[in-house]
Structures are given as structure tokens and as C-alpha cells.
């Protein structure tokens, strides 16, 4: 558990319903396909290698970060979200930093993620760079929707 300015970051598994409710307060809620949404979110929250949650003084969820890792070489950030009213306060950076630390540290781990255009400045600010060496196998047609 990490105490920060008015919030705590800890390893915590959320229930699917908690995460879905949190998504309504973020800009992350438009990244998921509509197909089997609740079922797939349940799998995500239960199976991510590392699950971090930031909570404020009243225990509300204000940030979430999930990662998949082998704890030896690589880490993939699947989800990073901060409640809209808490953006710009360093919570996302703190979550990613803790995620990297738990995965094995910056000396050992290469970190990847897939982001929308609006998130690129954030990831560049924390030291990530666009890469041309990642391959993708994507044969799924998703129906876009927004969690509301």
C-alpha cells in the first residue's frame, strides 16, 4: 500500500460491477467492445497479473491500473484510468510507476501499452515512446460503445 497526497494505491481485485461503475467516471469507458462486455470485464478484473486501485480518503475509487506481466522481461498495461475530477494530479503516473515496480522494476522490464490518440501525450510525459517493432493479430470486429 502506498499513501500519497490524499489517496492510497494498493493491490486490490475489484468486482466487475465496481470496475464498470468506475468506468462511467473516466474516459476509459469507450475502449471496450459491446460484445459480452460484462463477462469479459469479469475475466479482466479476475485474471490481470497485477491489479492496482487508487482510493481517496472516503475510499472512493479514483484510479485503476491493470497489467499483464511475466515478472521477468515485459509488462503490458491493459487498463489505466483516473476519474475525470482527479486527472492531472499525478495519480496515473503513480499507478504506472507502482505497476512497473511490482512487475520487476525499470531495470528489468520493458513496458508496452496500446492507447488512443488522446492518451499519447500522457505516456510520452512518463517516458514511453511510440514503437514500430510490435506485431498485432487482430481479427475481431468490435461494436464500439461507451460505458454510461
Locate each region found by the language model:
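A short helix-loop-beta-strand connector motif used in the catalytic cores of GNAT acetyltransferases and
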Residues: 42-53
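Conserved catalytic-core motifs of GNAT/GCN5-like acyltransferases
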Residues: 114, 124, 129-148
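Conserved acetyl-CoA pyrophosphate-binding loop and the N-cap/start of the following alpha-helix
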Residues: 86, 90-98
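Conserved GNAT acetyl-CoA-binding A-motif
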Residues: 103-116
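Short amphipathic alpha-helix that is part of the acyltransferase structural core
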Residues: 1-35, 134, 147-148
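Conserved beta-strand in the GNAT
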Residues: 53, 60-68, 74-76, 81
Amino acid at each position: 500500500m502506498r499513501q500519497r497526497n490524499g489517496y492510497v494505491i494498493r493491490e486490490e481485485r475489484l468486482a466487475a460491477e465496481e470496475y464498470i461503475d468506475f468506468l462511467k467516471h473516466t474516459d476509459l469507458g469507450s475502449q471496450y467492445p459491446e460484445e459480452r462486455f460484462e463477462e469479459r470485464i469479469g475475466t479482466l478484473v479476475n485474471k490481470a497479473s497485477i491489479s492496482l486501485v487508487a482510493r481517496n480518503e472516503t475510499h472512493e475509487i479514483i484510479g485503476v491500473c491493470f497489467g499483464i506481466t511475466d515478472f521477468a522481461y515485459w509488462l503490458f498495461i491493459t487498463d489505466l484510468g483516473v476519474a475525470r475530477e482527479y486527472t492531472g494530479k499525478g495519480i496515473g503516473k503513480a499507478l504506472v510507476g507502482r505497476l512497473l515496480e511490482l512487475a520487476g522494476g525499470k531495470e528489468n522490464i520493458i513496458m508496452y501499452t496500446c492507447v488512443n490518440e488522446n492518451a499519447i501525450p500522457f505516456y510520452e510525459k512518463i517516458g514511453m515512446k511510440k514503437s514500430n517493432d510490435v506485431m498485432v493479430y487482430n481479427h475481431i470486429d468490435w461494436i464500439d460503445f461507451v460505458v454510461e
